Amino acid sequence: VNVSLILKMLGIDNTALGVKAGFTGNYVEDYLKEKEITTDFIEVAGTTRINVFTKVIQDQKEYKLVNKGPKLSEEHVQRFLKKISELRKGDYLCVSGSLPQGVSPSILIEISRICFEKQVFLILDSSYEEILDCLSYQPFLLKPNEEELQEWFHTEVQTKDDYIFYGQELLKRGAKNILLSLGSEGALFMNNEKVLSGNSPTGMVVNTACSGDAMLGTFLAGWHQGLSLEKNLKRSIAAGSSTAFRKGLTDFSDVQELEQQIKIQEEE
């Protein structure tokens, strides 16, 4: 949903796919329609989850209370996969976040297979280790963070060289592009042609929730708009930082100013 909102803010029409449940699901759908975003949700029993993020200013700690949400049946899963199979060659599909109850992470592999066969550009932003099993289907873009790299490769990842090494390992396994979000350290973009790094601008962090979504949505919009990789990475880092410096998603009012603090450089 956050990626859909960011894309729309930047002038990219898109359709929000997924499931909805109860009054919270209806609220989300109504909000998206209010923003003139097309929706294509499967309705299920229960209630769409509400997650709570709390920042304790005194000790600069953030607490995330993530609810389970509704449980999906096998019928719901198959209906969702059917929607994916109806995508057309050249479409872009962004799969982001955690899966509902009743859905095995192996669904990511099936989605990857369908997109590969349909020649759909697949973007994966999820922490499950099954992401590694999706790489043979050559997803267009992965957006991991440093914690996910550590979990996937069962190792400590601490330096920029480490990030680049494991990012390139993902490329070797089949991913086409990597957008690696590094929080206060900025971000890296990698493909088989180049490696770019960018620092984070300074500011008071209010809430890190959704900053990765803002970065990803901005990057996808920039890709569609034909921005250079350097300009796109800079704007994407600024949008993610702008979101971290406020209570909700960025409105892009301060993004241009934040961009002035960001330097993009090509890594060897």
Which ranges hold each PLM region?
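Substrate-binding N-lobe of the ribokinase-like
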Residues: V1-T48, Q260-Q261
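Short, conserved phosphate/pyrophosphate- and ester-handling motifs at nucleotide-, phospho-/glycolipid
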Residues: L7, N145, G212
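Gly/Ala-rich phosphate-binding loop of Rossmann-like dinucleotide-binding domains
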Residues: K8, F116, H224
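Cofactor-binding loop segments of dinucleotide-utilizing enzymes, especially the Rossmann-like FAD-
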Residues: V19-G22, V44, I57, S98, ...
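Conserved phosphate-binding/catalytic loop of the ribokinase/pfkB sugar-kinase fold
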Residues: T54-K89
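Conserved beta-alpha-beta core of the PfkB/ribokinase-like small-molecule kinase fold
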Residues: Y92-D161
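Conserved phosphate-binding/catalytic region of the ribokinase-like
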Residues: R113, L132, K160-E268
